[in-house]
């Protein structure tokens, strides 16, 4: 199995690659983890991981700046329906648009907008950074197998995904109000938290992704 980790200048590639490799090894999954910005490499992948750090618009431009990359990702994820995982801004890019430093189009694969976090408690600082506990909205999802509600995972973000369809929100986190922590439909899943930084729970989610057959 070939897993493409997309290199477009906006992701924690080293830590994400190491987490994917460890999850595969510990989980007994035969997986080749390939960090790539090559369109043909993406088209040949069995699974795709899209990381992302920084501003929404910069990440979108980074993807668009690789000739044919957005089209290749759409072919693999939407047409061939191969498992796709977006991490942090990689998840946010699945939305219709982001409003960080203006209005910018997302990939539009899961309806919704990416908006600034505005906690009800003014004492809460932005960005939302550190460990926080997950609340599950979905009855079950394959990527959450073996992970209990209330499990702590690691976040660093100032913007959040507000889904058009609440049913696509798989998990939330409380930070002066509920924020989307995990989103998904069909073969697409995104996490606002960083599984590669979330220790045992993060490795479990990644291993689940590597075994996932949506």
UniProtKB/Swiss-Prot annotation:
Any one GO molecular function term: glutaminase activity
Chief location bin: cytoplasm
Catalyzed reactions: 5-[(5-phospho-1-deoxy-D-ribulos-1-ylimino)methylamino]-1-(5-phospho-beta-D-ribosyl)imidazole-4-carboxamide + L-glutamine = D-erythro-1-(imidazol-4-yl)glycerol 3-phosphate + 5-amino-1-(5-phospho-beta-D-ribosyl)imidazole-4-carboxamide + L-glutamate + H(+); L-glutamine + H2O = L-glutamate + NH4(+)
Pathway listed: Amino-acid biosynthesis; L-histidine biosynthesis; L-histidine from 5-phospho-alpha-D-ribose 1-diphosphate: step 5/9
GO CC, any one term: cytoplasm
Swiss-Prot/TrEMBL keywords: Amino-acid biosynthesis, Cytoplasm, Glutamine amidotransferase, Histidine biosynthesis, Hydrolase, Lyase
Alphabetical list of NCBIfam families matching this protein: IMP_synth_hisH
Complexes and interactors: Heterodimer of HisH and HisF.
Descriptive protein name: Imidazole glycerol phosphate synthase subunit HisH
Source organism phylogeny: Bacteria, Pseudomonadati, Pseudomonadota, Alphaproteobacteria, Rhodospirillales
Gene assigned in the entry: hisH
